[in-house]
Amino acid sequence: MSELIITPGCIVLIEGFDDIPAHQFLVDEVFDDFITGTALTGPFAGEYGEPEITLVLEVLSGNREG
């Protein structure tokens, strides 16, 4: 599997967990094992989160700045 290129400002798809379906997430910061940002869809839309980087299924769009 190829490594995903996750950068601040990109939108990623977070894998579903527990009773939460997969959802889009706007990335603020990228760390070694987790990212920070805001859920864009799903029951946590508008909420801040810190999902583990292993939950990222794909990068949906690149950096939204500029």
Q: What annotation goes with each model-predicted range?
A:
Residues 1, 14, 40-43:
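Intrinsically disordered, low-complexity boundary segments flanking structured domains
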Residues 1, 7, 51-54:
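Compositionally biased, low-complexity intrinsically disordered regions
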Residues 3-17:
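Short coil-to-beta transition motif at edge beta-strands of beta-rich domains
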Residues 21-30:
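Short beta-strand-centered aromatic/proline hotspots
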Residues 34-36:
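Short aromatic-glycine-enriched beta-strand elements
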Residues 39-66:
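Intrinsically disordered, low-complexity, charged/polar segments
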